[in-house]
Amino acid sequence: MSGKSWVLISTTSPQSLEDEILGRLLKILFVLFVDLMSIMYVVITS
């Protein structure tokens, strides 16, 4: 699937499967980033 068709699908149906998967991936990446930052903070301050 090309980027243009993906944008077209995501704009016409926000509740599409691709958007749900992308949202979950972004949530997981954000959680991992926060965990990494907290671990780095503990390592630096200890």
Curated annotation (Swiss-Prot):
GO cellular component term, pick one: sarcoplasmic reticulum membrane
Domain of life: Eukaryota
UniProt membrane topology term: Single-pass membrane protein
Disruption phenotype: Mice are born at expected Mendelian ratios and do not show obvious morphological abnormalities or differences in body or muscle weights. They however show enhanced Ca(2+) handling in skeletal muscle and improved exercise performance.
GO molecular function: enzyme inhibitor activity
Lumenal compartment spans: 43-46
Tissue: Specifically expressed in all skeletal muscles. Detected in both fast- and slow-type skeletal muscle. Not expressed in cardiac or smooth muscles.
Keywords: Membrane, Sarcoplasmic reticulum, Transmembrane, Transmembrane helix
GO biological process, one term: calcium ion import into sarcoplasmic reticulum
Induction pattern: Expression is regulated by MYEF2 and MYOD1.
Residue ranges annotated as Cytoplasmic topological domain: 1-21
Subunit structure: Homooligomer. Monomer. Interacts with ATP2A1/SERCA1. Interacts as a monomer with ATP2A2/SERCA2; the interaction inhibits ATP2A2 activity.
Job description of the protein: Inhibits the activity of ATP2A1/SERCA1 ATPase in sarcoplasmic reticulum by decreasing the apparent affinity of the ATPase for Ca(2+), thereby acting as a key regulator of skeletal muscle activity. Its high expression in adult skeletal muscle, suggests that it constitutes the predominant regulator of ATP2A1/SERCA1 in adult skeletal muscle. Also inhibits the activity of ATP2A2/SERCA2 and ATP2A3/SERCA3.
Protein name listed in UniProt: Myoregulin
Species for this entry: Mus musculus (Mouse)
Gene from which this protein is expressed: Mrln
